[in-house]
Amino acid sequence: MYNDQIHKITYSGVEVFEYTINGFPLMKRCHDNWLNATQILKIAELDKPRRTRILEKFAQKGLHEKIQGGCGKYQGTWVPSERAVELAHEYNVFDLIQPLIEYSGSAFMPMSTFTPQSNRKPTEAYRRNSPVKKSFSRPSHSLLYPYTSSNNMTSTSRMSGIHDALSLQSDFTRSPDMPSDSFTGSLHDIKASPFSSNNYAQSLLDYFLLPNTTQPPDFVYDRPSDWDVNAGIDEDGHTALHWAAAMGNLEMMHALLQAGANVVAVNYLQQTSLMRCVMFTMNYDLQTFEVVSELLQSAICMNDSFGQTVFHHIALLASSKSKMEAARYYMDILLQNLTATQSVDVAAQIINLQDDHGDTALLICARNGAKKCARLLLSFYASSSIPNNQGQYPTDFLSSKDMSFPENDDSPLNSKIEDNLIDNLKYPQSLDDHLSSKKPISYFSNKLTHQTLPNVFTQLSELSKCHEASLAEKQLTYNLAMEALEQTVRETETCQRLWNERTNNDENYLVNQREDLIHQCKKFLHTLKTARYYLETVQLHQLKKYVTYFSQIWSTDELADISETKNLVGHDTKTNRSSLSSKHEVDLFTAENEAAREKLVEQLCSLQAQRKQKINEILNLLSMGMYNTINTDQSGS
């Protein structure tokens, strides 16, 4: 039984015997029987920090070899079998690894005698219920890239693993009749066993299908020697692990993995358990996919008979609106797992893989209108510039706006899009390598790959440089503006401080000063009016005094002249009463004096008016123009 589970595989040019225990691979080198101590500690279910400490101490005690380059699964600390047995006894896993330690490889079938399983015909029942398929030119199953754990991976080993994976992938032939090489032959166990109608298969089907069966069959735990845990239990070649994974049955999955179930076993359509579980929503309903994907993550890099990866199947699930959220849930978890365990280039090539119709997972999502799934793929290095065999692009079904995250989206994936786009700009060669890995569909696609895209990247690089120069110039202008602003703020603060000192922080200082000034102006105007009044009074008094004085003088002289005239007239009358002309002369003299008096009064009035005007001008000059304004307002009112 154990011999059937031990397989000879070549990693980085080194042949090893591989034995899967509880979902973890354990390797023993064929040429020296050394074992991978790192994998033994993983089987003991120790976390990475503890494994690291144990291996550091263990390596100091004896012979060992650390492998960091090459294939990821082959990496780790290798020790002789004696030291491996010692380590296994220390952590109570010797019983689990004993079959591989005792295995000599003598009963192992030469790989050259393996027959490619794609030539095996399905059963009659399967052929009756299956649609007619075209002949597939790829091997029976395709492990696109050897799954690598991120635990012991460095940047150097990651790149080495990529080259090994690409070289292994190039070894796949396009003819199903070509004998399998060391890589394809080593995956002989991946193909599901033929359909079996024995009691084991029927019991497993009853467990999965009948509602009243809640406990796994006893033989799952007892593991009888005649039970093949990787055998197909239905007419489609599904193994028990396929069923358990699709139904989200974690208890059964753990039991099957403990029994040695192969994570990468496939059905007749070369579909793995991981592919089958994303075709249904049970793991979404139970929220168990995160655990299931961890258990089945070794199969994340595989594709089926139609060239479709697990991401293609999730995209197909998104064709139903009722299953859209489940598809997004599956897509998010698997993309996180893929990018956490694989390098950027390998992850991008797996995500952008085309099926037999040339469809990528992104194109299928776009065709189904699954915007959220498309956004997730774009945030994890998916390319929207890969057409299918009909020349269709994802942008033919969804606009760029539909496939971009909203600006107000606070999702962490929103910020990751920008980082991934920057990575794509920094490493455009990876995209060009992917596009050139397949034969161009037409002359135009070849021209696009080798001429247009490099020009686009060149233009983008120049645009980036121009943007950086413009940004530097704007930054300099901004710095100068900030310095000027800081200087202005400092001056403003100084002025404010001086003002506060002058006003004693009185907010009504200006109002109070204005009111005081108005009060002083009114007081000054009142003083001017009083001065004018007194000046007018004094001048009027003096004028009256002068008028009275001159009037008295005038009246006395006139009366004297009249008296003298009368005396003369009376004397003449007495002496010569015949002389009448003297009286007429007296009347003429009196009239002339009256006219002169009136003329003097007019001149006096004119002088009085001029005097008042001069006084007003003097007062207005002293009051800076306010006196006339106030007098005008008062006269108008």
UniProtKB/Swiss-Prot annotation:
Superkingdom of source: Eukaryota
This protein's GO CC annotations: chromatin; MBF transcription complex; nucleus
HTH APSES-type domain boundaries: 6-112
Residue ranges of ANK repeats: 236-265, 357-386
Region described as Disordered: 114-137
UniProt GO molecular function: DNA-binding transcription activator activity, RNA polymerase II-specific; RNA polymerase II cis-regulatory region sequence-specific DNA binding
Gene Ontology BP annotations: positive regulation of DNA-templated transcription; positive regulation of transcription by RNA polymerase II; regulation of transcription by RNA polymerase II
Regions recorded as binding DNA: 37-58
Keyword match Metal-binding: no
Keywords carried by this UniProt record: ANK repeat, Cell cycle, DNA-binding, Repeat
InterPro entries the record matches: Ankyrin_rpt (IPR002110), Ankyrin_rpt-contain_sf (IPR036770), HTH_APSES_sf (IPR036887), KilA/APSES_HTH (IPR018004), SWI6-like (IPR051642), Tscrpt_reg_HTH_APSES-type (IPR003163)
Subunit: DSC1 contains cdc10 and sct1/res1.
Role description: Acts as a positive regulator of the mitotic cell cycle and as a negative regulator of sexual differentiation. May be involved in the transcriptional regulation of the cdc22 and cdt1 genes. Is an integral component of the DSC1-like complex.
Protein name per the record: Cell division cycle-related protein res1/sct1
Originating species: Schizosaccharomyces pombe (strain 972 / ATCC 24843) (Fission yeast)
